[in-house]
Amino acid sequence: MIETPAHKWIAKFSSSSDTFNVVKSEFVAMRLAALAGLDVAVVQLTAAAGRDVLLIQRFDRQHTADGYQRRAMVSALTILELDELMARYASYETLAEIVRHRFDAPVPTLHELFGRLVFNVLCGNTDDHARNHAAFWNGSSLALTPAYDICPQARAGNEASQAMLIVGQQRSSRLATCLQAAPHFVLDDAAATALIARQITSIQQHFDAVCQEANLAEVDRNLLRVRNILNPAIFEGAPDALQRLVAGFR
């Protein structure tokens, strides 16, 4: 934990066992998510004792004249009334239904949640389990917290699955699955496709600059580009218009 005059920060350190630069890859994904218009935690990169360090600004602490005050939070696992043994049953579809009834500003919240689902698929973050989603609780209603822990995951092949079910029993990391779920987020097919297209365009526009900002090594940059970010497998079954958007990314 690191404290500055106005903020508290959580520090994540690189590990000697990492097979790629996890810390910088998470920074890249979080910055790309913010540039794509999502509400995400503020992140910074630094180094300590020769190791890369990712700093994540705590959004559950508010600085006041009397010091820091805690903001009550609950994880999506708790909201879904599941425990760790039942976490595999956590579902974006079910979470969307709860948002409709228990969250402030449900429609924009649903659109934000759908955007986060899509971005997780686009950037290869398959570790989107229910503890990696949360909401503020004010005693009467819920409000989505900024997104956090968005990190591309190592994958052995092209096919991948999200940690949370997306719609029905489907969790495949494909844009077609996201589009199938879109009505649960109050989005018709055209609106959902347009949202996905905006994110794809934003990622391509900002990828190189954000990697440069992170001073990400060329080998790790190429790994993200080839294996994680906009992986060809996620476009299986997606509209041709979306597939054409990434023709020049690699």
Label each PLM-derived region with a short phrase.
Residues 141-142, 205-250:
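Regulatory N- and C-terminal appendages and interdomain linkers associated
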Residues 53-59, 146, 204-211:
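A short beta-strand motif that forms the metal-chelation/ATP-contact edge
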Residues 17-36, 91-155:
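Conserved kinase catalytic-core segment
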Residues 75, 79, 83-92, 137-192:
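Catalytic-core segments of enzymes that bind and process phosphorylated/nucleotide-bearing substrates
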Residues 48-53, 117, 132-139, 198-200, ...:
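A glycine-rich phosphate-binding loop feature that marks nucleotide/adenosyl-phosphate handling sites
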